[in-house]
Amino acid sequence: MNQQRLTQVILAPIVSEKSNVLAEKRNQMTFKVLANATKPEIKAAVELLFGVQVADVTTVTIKGKVKRFGRTLGRRSDVKKAYVSLAAGQELDLEAAAAAADKE
């Protein structure tokens, strides 16, 4: 796992009602990741980018929906989500991390 690959593994944080509840109650963060990313890569990427200890990573692949475009059927892309459990005592503030990245 080289550093360039690790910086590309995490595509975006997922901000939703469910992800906010998980962050508050279980200390879990939710990210959209590359479809071919592995759990060790995701763990290393979060630890590298945000400087926190990761306890566990759970992944799920959401299959793309079939959508109609006029007379033709199309399909949206599959999306892989990673639920990252932080170690006890660790906290991740995405707004502060984004502000720090903007300053650099």
UniProtKB/Swiss-Prot annotation:
Source taxon at top rank: Bacteria
Family annotation (Gene3D superfamilies): 3.30.70.330
GO biological process entries: translation
GO cellular component, one term: cytosolic large ribosomal subunit
Record keywords, A-Z: Ribonucleoprotein, Ribosomal protein, RNA-binding, rRNA-binding
GO MF: rRNA binding; structural constituent of ribosome
Pfam families: Ribosomal_L23 (PF00276)
Coiled coil: none
Protein family (similarity comment): Belongs to the universal ribosomal protein uL23 family.
Protein role: One of the early assembly proteins it binds 23S rRNA. One of the proteins that surrounds the polypeptide exit tunnel on the outside of the ribosome. Forms the main docking site for trigger factor binding to the ribosome.
HAMAP family assigned to the protein according to its UniProt record, in alphabetical order: Ribosomal_uL23_B
Misc: Present in outer membrane vesicle formulations which are used as vaccines in human.
Family annotation (NCBIfam families): PRK05738.1-3, PRK05738.2-4
Subunit structure: Part of the 50S ribosomal subunit. Contacts protein L29, and trigger factor when it is bound to the ribosome.
Protein name stated in the entry: Large ribosomal subunit protein uL23
Higher taxonomy: Bacteria, Pseudomonadati, Pseudomonadota, Betaproteobacteria, Neisseriales
